[in-house]
Amino acid sequence: MNVENKKIFKHFQNNCYSFQLISYDAKKISYSQLIKKLKQENSRQVLFNSEVMIELIKETAINNKEYIVAALKIGSEDDLEVQENINKIILSMRTDYSNVVRLIEELSWCYDNESIDISEIKIVGRGGNYDNAKILSNGIYFGDEEIFNNFIVPVLTRYFNGE
């Protein structure tokens, strides 16, 4: 079985960043070789700090009603109480998505571009849309390219280009 990994990269050209999802086979090229190769091509890896992760959450509540937050993992395993509260809020969002506001409030302590306290987020389609994606803070991406193109790229574009 051939499992391809995907990694999100940004490329700066004409005074703005563009984003691409690069697939790679870990049996053919190592992670470090991939990073090195793309650096030589003037691309940089996208790291998802907590601020970017929360911007993705806000996007599901404000601009993009096609996708919802299905799971979120805090990086520190010592903070079980916070993780349990987050899990409860996300569970409540299944019946009342307006609880996303509670989730954003619960995460306000880590809304920082120097924080990586949110280690992963899972986004799924709603209303019969079965697309799903999981994003790790190191920019590794599991999921549908449709979510990447239609949901994640617009958030990254606003965040990195100030649009």
Model-derived segments and spans:
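Intrinsically disordered, low-complexity, charge-rich terminal extensions
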Residues: M1-E163
